[in-house]
Amino acid sequence: YVEKKIVNGEQVEDDLAADTRTFIYVEVLQSALNNDYVLCGRSLARGNDSNSFGSYNAEDLKTGKYERYQNELCHLNIFTWLGVIGMLLYSLIYIRSSYLAVYRSNSYFLKLIGVFIAFHWAYGWIEDTTNFDILNISLWSAIGMGLSSQFRAMTDKDFKQWVWGIFYKKKKHL
């Protein structure tokens, strides 16, 4: 699908079906192979070598490194920082939490949270940034709920009471 729009008085075409991710995968994997950090990662202090985005850091920010410290793909960031070992462990957290929430919980609501967790794991291969924001705080809270035996033991009624208890507190008269 091609969208036509007017930008600065000129007609511009945007191909909404264009592949905007493959080159990022190529850069990340090539950087890992060239710098020998496939297994254990490059550390949180470094990014992947990037011909497409590295010049900004090297030249404009004067770092001298043609690296991209963070990509818009969650799992590629984890791979760059922690390698295959870290990527597997990171994925196991998502998978275990989702599995427990879907198959080992008493609440329909927690089963939905398990599906939400599984969706985010899959979406992390396409676009799901690793930022400290409300989305990731919510995601990791959901992962914690899936891993919690207390939350999994809740019934739908218990879960509703817990949620309502967050917003409405009865005043205690002393």
Predicted regions and their residues:
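Generic hydrophobic alpha-helical membrane-span motif
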Residues: 47, 89-92, 133
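Short, flexible micro-motifs
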Residues: 44, 86-89, 147
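Hydrophobic transmembrane alpha-helices and their immediate junctions
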Residues: 80-121, 155-156
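Transmembrane alpha-helices of multi-pass inner-membrane enzymes
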Residues: 112-124, 129-169
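Eukaryotic scaffold repeat domains enriched in small/polar residues
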Residues: 172-174
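Long extracytoplasmic/lumenal interhelical loops at the membrane interface
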Residues: 11-82
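Compositionally biased, low-complexity regions
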Residues: 1-6
